From Swiss-Prot:
Entry keyword Glycosyltransferase: yes
Cofactor: Mg(2+)
Gene: pyrE
Protein name in the entry: Orotate phosphoribosyltransferase
Residues bound to 5-phospho-alpha-D-ribose 1-diphosphate: 94, 98, 100, 120-128
E.C. no: 2.4.2.10
Length: 210
């Protein structure tokens, strides 16, 4: 499944690999990869494959789930499709409470004691997903874990998720993506080496000249 989803993401341009012309993330870090999973919304067959895959992950790892929660905003649509497939209630969680109206951070019903799985589009450092998990825990929910479309497999992300004591599973990952890109002839050996070096230590820009 990992390579199938990776292939979909590459084909629709949801993921770009530019090891020779790095992107600059909002954090200022140079990166050979940029992921925009919002593009999956525009491709019915791709989003259906993602919804089916996320459902499979949830049934395998979190079979007692009672509520599906999407992260705002990128996880909302995927959470809705998954909850519909599983015939479960759905809510979504903002990064912070609204400054008007009821001031809700959680929209929809997620009640105390309910078992919740969070749906996220992308795991990089894990920050937005963890914010969602913490809000649900504060509301008294039992968060079983997180499922996502893609992960960069960054050590910093893994460490933050472990520190937050939350399990996380992704449909596809950086390793599968680079492998598929190489198989498709989208990157050569030199580019593959740069991509591998970046993942080892993203903060060290030595990978750019690797």
């Amino acid at each position: 499944m990992k390579k199938e989803i990776a292939s979909h993401l590459l084909e629709i341009g949801a993921v770009f690999l530019q090891p020779n012309d790095p992107f600059t993330w909002s954090s200022g870090m140079k990166s050979p990869i940029y992921c925009d999973n919002r593009l999956t919304l525009s491709y019915p067959k791709v989003r259906q494959a993602i919804a089916a895959g996320l459902e499979e992950l949830i049934k395998e790892h979190f079979p007692t789930v009672e509520v599906i929660a999407g992260t705002a905003t990128a996880g909302i649509a995927h959470a809705a499709w998954v909850s519909d497939r599983m015939d479960l209630p759905m809510c979504y969680v903002r990064s912070k409470a609204k400054g008007h109206g009821k001031g809700n951070q959680i929209e929809g019903k997620a009640e105390k004691g309910q078992k919740v799985v969070v749906v996220e589009d992308l795991i990089s450092t894990g920050g937005s997903a963890i914010t969602c998990v913490e809000a649900l825990r504060e509301a008294g929910c039992e968060v079983l874990g997180i499922v996502s479309i893609f992960t960069y497999e960054l050590e910093s992300g893994k460490e933050k998720l472990e520190a937050a004591n939350v399990a996380s599973y992704s449909l596809s990952d950086y390793s599968a993506l680079t492998e598929v890109a190489a198989e498709k002839g989208m990157i050569g050996q030199a580019e593959t080496k740069k991509l591998q070096e970046w993942r080892k230590n993203p903060a060290d820009e030595a990978w750019i000249t690797a």
